[in-house]
């Protein structure tokens, strides 16, 4: 049976460096997918950037709804703008940072109903360059 999910029903996650709303996941009945709406604010002077994270068991597909940013990954740096999509393979450390003057809005998809298993995320930068 099809189901409708609204942004108002989304679970707010307390993740460092961004606002993240989990709209669809195993917690609300999904069997094999998680979808999040993520807003990365414009960095403030002196603010410590968040560190890279990884998802060991699954890919992450990120679609840019609005704004400008860069995804720093073990395989390289990828500039992003509205309409771009980046696919991160399982286990690759990565972080997306806002490089624009307005919030960076992303839609993130994972082929798993529970992405907490295998996700490792430190609080601050470790290993990738600061980008402001």
Residue ranges and their predicted role:
Residues 32-34, 58, 103-104:
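A structure-centric signal for secondary-structure junctions around beta-strands
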Residues 36-56:
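Conserved short histidine dyad/triad with adjacent acidic residue
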Residues 26-29, 85, 99:
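Short polar/acidic secondary-structure junctions
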Residues 22, 35-39, 61, 77, ...:
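Conserved hydrophobic/aromatic beta-strand scaffold that supports enzyme active sites
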Residues 1-35, 51, 117-132:
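A short, N-terminal "cap"/entry segment at the start of jelly-roll beta-barrel domains
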Residues 70, 90-116:
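Ligand-binding loop in jelly-roll beta-barrel domains
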Residues 28-31, 40-46, 68, 112-116:
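Short, charged/polar surface micro-motifs in flexible loops or helix N-caps
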Residues 47-49, 56-82, 89-92, 97:
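A short beta-strand-loop-beta hairpin characteristic of the jelly-roll/cupin
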């Amino acid at each position: 049976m099809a189901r409708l999910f609204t942004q108002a029903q989304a679970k707010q996650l307390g993740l460092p460096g961004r606002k993240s709303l989990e709209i669809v996941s195993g917690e609300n009945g999904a069997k094999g997918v998680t979808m999040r709406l993520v807003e990365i604010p414009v960095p403030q002077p002196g603010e410590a950037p968040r560190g890279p994270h990884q998802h060991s068991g699954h890919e992450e597909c990120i679609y840019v709804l609005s704004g400008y940013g860069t995804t720093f990954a073990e395989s390289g740096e990828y500039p992003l703008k509205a309409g771009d999509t980046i696919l991160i393979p399982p286990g690759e450390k990565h972080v997306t940072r806002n490089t624009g003057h307005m919030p960076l809005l992303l839609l993130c998809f994972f082929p798993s109903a529970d992405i907490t298993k295998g996700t490792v995320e430190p609080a601050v930068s470790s290993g990738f360059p600061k980008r402001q």
